[in-house]
Amino acid sequence: GSEMCIRDSLCPTQELVDAYEMADGTTPILGYNADGSPIINSESGYSEEGFTEEADAEGYYPENTFNMFVDREPRFYATVTYSGAYWRGRQIDFRMGAPDGRTGGPDYTTTGYLMRKFLDEDGVDILRGVFVNKTWNYFRLGELYLNYAEALNEASGPVDDVYKYVNLIRKRSGLPGLKAGLSQDEMRQKIRRERQVELALETHRYFDCNRWKISDQVKAVHGMDIGARDNSFFKRTLVEERVFEAPKHYLWPFHQDEVNKNPDIFVQNPGWGGIN
């Protein structure tokens, strides 16, 4: 999963935050233990303890930023608003009871993150009725590159063109190219991660997970502890355990009335018998 929320639009999940690389292209989270805790890459410089004392020289994060969000790749800062990030000249605070946190009403982030991607920080003022129209990208060049790279890797393995088009995406994002000598499966995992972050919040993740047949492996949704009033907010917390039954949920049901019109040739999808 990449996002969930109630009234605050799309809320990125901890799993999406984990997918972003460090600024130097290293992978901070190598996987997860059985209890959902992260397997941290000790060589990445990533930490889930403490706060930075200095702001980023390029302005990606301010001082007193939780170290989880320090020195991440540029796409992270362009996509996710985290507690401590700046928005319209002030530092956001999602802790319980804080100006941007849960205060008793329905307007709060359920994961401790909000979407920044697509938002106009300067031109929108909802309270005054000022809006900015955005053109939705149903298909864009980055997706085309990743589609081609994925298909070519599945057909021929990690040949030169696979590296070329994945690295075009990475270069534009300020990241170094992939290391040479990856196996087909290693490249497959790199492409999947690249799709997760490059196309984040663009309605791809659900369908990607289904066609890769991994939706039954990515059911848990984690975030920060939005019920905390102090720095214990910055603790991984289970937000939701989703239900996904494989193979049933990889297909949607036909309306049973349609199946009943010609049951000899029209067969309901597996697991969905009796759907009306």
Give residue spans per PLM region.
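Acidic/polar-rich alpha-helix caps and helix-coil junctions
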Residues: 2-3, 7-276
